[in-house]
């Protein structure tokens, strides 16, 4: 998450009891989307439909097949960010996870893994072919345009343990959805880390309420979403960046957000802020359609993750980036 300097303000304190009173959702005109409107980029493989339906801060351990699209991004052998599988060659993550000054060869991707200490027979390791950063990254906001497309050198082999997530329709209405986020971030404000993939159910919070909570100096752009469980203090934390925020609709999971920034961990008045996937949908689809696959090589299966014992926390200035 990110820590932006701002005051809560009187309106923020007045709003807090309202958030505790009942579950809060981003609401609009009630409208249901048929299952076919989910955007799949994976060909014949069904997206957003794990075979098994089943810790972030205060979260619970995730089962191996519950979130099969989850990705672990590593830098120099350490987990630094999460991500999600879009198709056999493409992963979606956060732009701030990639430093333009670092060599691409120092990054790699793991899929089919829930414990960072050890791989299993479903774990696959991939080198990165290229990373495409959204052109507005940090242009209008310190962490605005926080979206990255990662193309792999070889194709992911799909199974019950490794599957893509669906992209949402561009006109998706976020109303009464069951939304979850996953990741390997810190599990306590004191910096305690864990190796197990964690999950947390996070209610969506309307942007205008989120803006009041953060104050005017921590401005939110229309491309951003907010989510947190105000009652239980479940939230995203450092190391969760790039991981997906997914919501279930018509028995299919859709990715609506990318973990981006916030203020500390488990701060009851500061929800996690996510890049809104629907806002960037046309950009994502355009690049995945026009860019050819890299020269094909055999996928690399890992027997053990490379030195993946420590969660690496990225800090960008005074913005504590997840």
UniProtKB/Swiss-Prot annotation:
Disulfide bonds join 81-97, 179-247, 210-226, 237-265. One of its GO terms (biological process) is proteolysis. It comes from Mus musculus (Mouse). This is Serine protease 38. Its EC number is 3.4.21.-. Its main location: secreted. Belongs to the peptidase S1 family. Residues 56-289 form the Peptidase S1 domain. Keywords: Disulfide bond, Glycoprotein, Hydrolase, Protease, Secreted, Serine protease, Signal. The gene is Prss38. GO terms for cellular component: extracellular region. It is found in: Secreted. The keyword Protease applies.
